[in-house]
């Protein structure tokens, strides 16, 4: 299930980023007193009383030179579209302003749960001055102080009350769920159409739990699949063209519901920095990953071109060294038939479970081949290992001192596990833990 999404909405300079940073527990947004400061990072993961959620700071939208009220409206519209719950942020020192009323009108029409927060209530005496905010029409205002961290617990308690109830996915464990992520115009939707066109066994378009997304189930050679649409495939007008960062959030929500992530690149244009960022989201998710080079038909090539492009991918995406690469053309459908077998392979690897005795044989053989490292006269000692999870395969290695597990030796162990058990397209996680 995807995490609920909380959006912080409000006119500039009411303290959205300060509250955002308080909730996620680290300073991610740039906080300044200048209204309309833009930020590079406008979403993050939050947690409150075992409720995990994603949170958006709408102050991260850079609209440009648009009129002031248009900016507010566009912020609110994006938040309305993406969020399950909206925190409507106001400023207790300023009282209710015309801009607050403009935001309120938009949010009132949204039919989304809205929790009204009055920020900059820095002392108890100021609480008596928040009653004017009832006039905005969202019930009880929650007085908070982003600077001092006051009142956030009560605010988040109320926010969590409005999270959607957790629903079970309607697909069984044998169904492979995958999504396509990539920058605009790399051919994601064309590739979906090419895949569906090969078999044309579209069971139905089932509305997914991700807002706006449509899950497309289909079957090929007896294997059931579901394409989790990122909802970024469809253009949504001017607001979305100017808020590209929100396509990242939609992609992340699709990734959360997927077993396999296809990172789609443009073979004609080559690799750019944005591709690397997008690929990083796939890697960080712990999902199985396939790198797809689309538009290969448009590339002038000889017998060395594919190898050179693959080497370029490996150089840029060193963190995805485990991901297989598929070259194809969605437009001509050339080589598209090679994709599903690779998806099957990485999905199977993602779910491999290794017997403990066999696992420990491999670990001890690896140690014999390459002795454990030392640090300040102390040598890492590995006692035994066990697998604790799949999707991705996760192993706990019990040692004398976890601090002695150098990242390079951890990488060596991962490579030995990969070679020994045929892990393809899936990250492997190793957790060093002290033996009791």
Curated annotation (Swiss-Prot):
Associates with the 50S ribosomal subunit. GTP 1 binds at residues 10-17, 57-61, 119-122. It comes from Bacillus cytotoxicus (strain DSM 22905 / CIP 110041 / 391-98 / NVH 391-98). GO terms for molecular function: GTP binding; ribosome binding. GTP 2 binds at residues 182-189, 229-233, 294-297. Keywords: GTP-binding, Nucleotide-binding, Repeat, Ribosome biogenesis. Pfam families: KH_dom-like (PF14714), MMR_HSR1 (PF01926). Residues 352-436 form the KH-like domain. Residues 4-167, 176-351 form the EngA-type G domain. GTPase that plays an essential role in the late steps of ribosome biogenesis. This is GTPase Der. Belongs to the TRAFAC class TrmE-Era-EngA-EngB-Septin-like GTPase superfamily. EngA (Der) GTPase family. GO terms for biological process: ribosome biogenesis.
